[in-house]
């Protein structure tokens, strides 16, 4: 196959799509290039459907090869290891964007692999993977309803930029990744520095317009590869008569069940209705072996029709009756309770409860040694703020093995972390490494938003001087023709059966984090404006409830948290603190029980829960790094006697020479007539040459001391007064 190339211009830069050059045995293979960043994306789908499942078995893997940036992995085996957080989050971005677009009922295992094979340190590769995934699927025979395309939108200096460079992103106050089709925004993920709802909407619409050339390029690429027909598959069965019977047997019962407020009570009743449905159908067919056998064979189909009844009823209840599960109105938020400081030995803690969703959140303050070190294409990255989200099985009344965090947990944690990072104090004002852990105690929707609220309270309880409190809310959408309902603080059912999951986090002043997944086309600007406006009102209500527990950061950190003091020394004196083989710094930390971190610029951070120990360590460091000052008088110790003078240590590690002529104002025949080794002596620094050699004078020190009738002898190693 001859390689085929198509190009599109996005944000003034050319994006290249190429197929037919590599990975030709994949069902779809596209090479995406922006600048010198290149991502290879492949799509493959199994020939046969996977039996016994009720979901689409799609796997998306995004991987960054360190050779792409000319780097060798730092692991023991010098190979890439488990996926990084960036790889996991990008895999989720692609999955969330593409999954809703596959044909309903298609159940063949499908895998999309995006591999970064070149990185130019300017153009990020996540949006290339997103566009490449759509293109690879679009040119294949896999039943995919694309194309879509990905773009990053940033606001730099008040101007919106499509696919900004890494340098531009560093100066941006808004940074979102989004996927869009011809007529709809499909997915949004990003953060901001308290921007307004109007700015966010403009950014999203700007991004949707920016991807249109990429959609044209994908269509052109598909046409150039022969418009391969989509493969045939068995669509979902639709027995109109059986569907009507299922509805007749369950509609009123489902109506009663959805009137129950408590989640497990409601779920239990809905499960009972399903059993009653199957039993009723079997009783109706009693005595007819063929019909009974048919019911057994079609049980999965019958359950599917029952799920449709639940779907139809809940949506009708919302759009027609303007009533939600539990009787709430469209903008109503569940009851909120907040508690802080409930874990006595933890640096900061909170318990945030909203309806049947609850998060127990703890904050830990650490030192520079606790920073997370992450190897990325851009180099080694150090994270001083982390938020980890955990979703144990008991939170939803289930029994499962406890395993390491999955993609969902990592994604929810990243969303909450981004929401709070925007209000964290700068490092020079608060030099701590901060770890927030959110453990979900119970869940019925919006647990990630509970983590944001609980995380904020926990940070304030820990005394972290955040700029402003942050809250999060999950919004939903039900759209039936012209009937539209926008829901605040959605439940799990409303998320599952709705058309949009829109999470918005921020302060009273503006948005700090956003995540949106839309399952339908045609979400208009008006819908986005109403959703964001309703979210802002809900956010302010939640902030008010949080303020009842704690309205501002505590004035001091926990007694159990380390106290960190930072001092500055000359960089060339760093070696004096470290000592040969680290001997000196190890001695200081052992004697004081402190943790010491030294930066290349001479910043020295000393940490300990005991402030007295911090001061002790600072005194020792000052003693090692202080500089001799010309004209100052010191008490020193004679370390060596020579014919021409004496070497005196004026403070630890620093010696100077008293020439024999500077011992006394009288003639001295022998140095040993005046001084002896180990003797303490008052000396004055009379010069320091370019090489750092110090000249001392005993006679000038004595003369100066005699002139000061109120003078006192200075302590050893310190200037005289």
Swiss-Prot record:
PROSITE patterns, sorted: KH_TYPE_1, S1
Keyword Transferase applies: yes
Keyword field: Cytoplasm, Magnesium, Metal-binding, Nucleotidyltransferase, RNA-binding, Transferase
Binding site for Mg(2+): 495, 501
Any one cellular-component term (Gene Ontology): cytosol
A Gene Ontology biological process term: RNA processing
SMART domains (UniProt xref): KH, S1
Predominant localisation class: cytoplasm
Any GO MF annotation of the entry: RNA binding
Keyword flag Metal-binding: yes
Residue span(s) of domain KH: 562-621
CDD domains: KH-I_PNPase, RNase_PH_PNPase_1, RNase_PH_PNPase_2, S1_PNPase
Pfam families per UniProt: KH_1, PNPase, RNase_PH, RNase_PH_C, S1
Cofactor: Mg(2+)
Subcellular location per the Swiss-Prot or TrEMBL entry: Cytoplasm
Domain S1 motif residue range list: 631-699
Reaction catalysed by this enzyme: RNA(n+1) + phosphate = RNA(n) + a ribonucleoside 5'-diphosphate
EC number: 2.7.7.8
UniProt-listed HAMAP family: PNPase
Function as written in the Swiss-Prot or TrEMBL entry: Involved in mRNA degradation. Catalyzes the phosphorolysis of single-stranded polyribonucleotides processively in the 3'- to 5'-direction.
Similarity comment: Belongs to the polyribonucleotide nucleotidyltransferase family.
Record-given protein name: Polyribonucleotide nucleotidyltransferase
Organism listed in the record: Anaeromyxobacter dehalogenans (strain 2CP-C)
Organism classification: Bacteria, Pseudomonadati, Myxococcota, Myxococcia, Myxococcales
Gene responsible for this protein: pnp
């Amino acid at each position: 196959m001859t390689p085929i190339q198509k190009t599109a211009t996005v944000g003034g830069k050319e994006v290249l799509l190429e197929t037919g050059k590599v990975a030709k045995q994949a069902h779809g293979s596209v090479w995406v290039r922006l600048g010198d960043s290149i991502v290879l994306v492949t799509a493959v789908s199994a020939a046969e459907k996977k039996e016994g499942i009720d979901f689409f078995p799609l796997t998306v893997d995004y991987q960054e090869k360190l050779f792409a940036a000319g780097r060798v992995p730092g692991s023991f085996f010098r190979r890439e290891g488990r996926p990084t957080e960036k790889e996991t989050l990008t895999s989720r971005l692609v999955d969330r964007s593409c999954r809703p677009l596959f044909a309903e009922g298609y159940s063949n295992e499908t895998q999309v692999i995006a591999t970064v094979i070149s990185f130019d340190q300017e153009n990020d590769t996540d949006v290339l993977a997103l566009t490449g995934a759509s293109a690879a699927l679009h040119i294949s025979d896999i039943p995919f309803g694309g194309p879509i395309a990905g773009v990053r939108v940033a606001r730099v200096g008040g101007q919106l930029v499509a696919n900004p460079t890494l340098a531009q992103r560093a100066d941006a106050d808004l940074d979102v990744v989004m996927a869009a089709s011809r007529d709809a925004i499909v997915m949004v993920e990003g953060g901001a520095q308290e921007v307004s709802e109007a700015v966010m909407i403009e950014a999203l619409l700007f991004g949707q317009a920016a991807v249109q050339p990429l959609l044209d390029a994908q269509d052109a690429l598909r046409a150039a590869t022969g418009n391969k027909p989509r493969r045939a598959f068995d669509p979902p069965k639709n027995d109109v008569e059986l569907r009507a019977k299922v509805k007749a047997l369950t509609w009123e019962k489902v109506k009663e069940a959805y009137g129950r407020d408590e989640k497990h009570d409601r779920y239990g009743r809905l499960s009972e209705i399903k059993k009653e449905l199957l039993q009723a159908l079997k009783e109706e067919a009693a005595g007819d072996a063929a019909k009974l056998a048919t019911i057994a064979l079609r049980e999965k189909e019958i359950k599917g029709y029952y799920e449709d009844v639940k779907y139809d009823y809940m949506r009708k209840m919302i759009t027609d009756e303007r009533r939600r599960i539990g009787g709430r109105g469209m903008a109503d938020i569940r009851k909120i309770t907040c508690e802080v400081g409930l874990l006595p030995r933890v640096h900061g803690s909170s318990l945030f409860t909203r309806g049947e969703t609850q998060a127990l959140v703890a904050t830990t303050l650490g030192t520079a040694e606790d920073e997370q070190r992450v190897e990325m294409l851009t180099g080694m990255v150090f994270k001083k703020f982390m938020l980890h989200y955990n979703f144990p099985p008991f939170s939803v009344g289930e029994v499962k093995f406890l395993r390491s965090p999955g993609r969902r947990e990592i994604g929810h944690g990243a969303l909450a972390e981004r929401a709070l990072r925007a209000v964290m104090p700068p490092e020079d004002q608060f030099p701590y490494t901060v770890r927030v852990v959110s453990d979900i105690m119970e869940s019925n929707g919006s647990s990630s938003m509970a983590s944001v609220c609980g995380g904020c309270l926990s940070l304030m309880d820990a005394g972290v001087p955040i700029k402003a409190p942050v809250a999060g809310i999950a919004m939903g959408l039900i759209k039936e023709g012209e009937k539209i309902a926008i829901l605040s603080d959605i439940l799990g059912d409303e998320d599952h059966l709705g058309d949009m999951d829109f999470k918005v986090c921020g302060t009273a002043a503006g948005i700090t984090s956003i995540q949106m997944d839309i399952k339908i086309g045609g979400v208009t600007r008006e819908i986005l404006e109403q959703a964001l406006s309703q979210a802002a009102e809900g956010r302010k209500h939640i902030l008010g409830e949080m303020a009842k527990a704690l309205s501002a950061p505590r004035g001091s950190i926990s007694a159990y948290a380390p106290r960190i003091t930072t001092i500055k020394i000359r960089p060339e004196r760093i070696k004096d603190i470290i000592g040969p083989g680290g001997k000196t710094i190890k001695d200081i930390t052992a004697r004081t029980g402190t943790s010491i971190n030294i930066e290349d610029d001479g910043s020295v951070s000393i940490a300990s829960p005991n402030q007295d120990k911090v001061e002790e360590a600072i005194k020792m460091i000052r003693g090692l790094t202080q500089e001799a000052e010309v004209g100052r008088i010191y008490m020193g110790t004679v370390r060596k006697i020579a014919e021409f003078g004496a070497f005196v240590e004026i403070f630890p590690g620093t010696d100077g020479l008293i020439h024999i002529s500077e011992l006394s104002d009288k003639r001295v025949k022998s140095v040993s007539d005046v001084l002896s080794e180990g003797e303490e002596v008052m000396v004055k620094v009379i010069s320091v040459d370019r090489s750092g050699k110090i000249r001392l004078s005993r006679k000038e020190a004595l003369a100066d001391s005699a002139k000061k009738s109120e003078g006192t002898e200075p302590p050893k190693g310190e200037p005289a007064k």
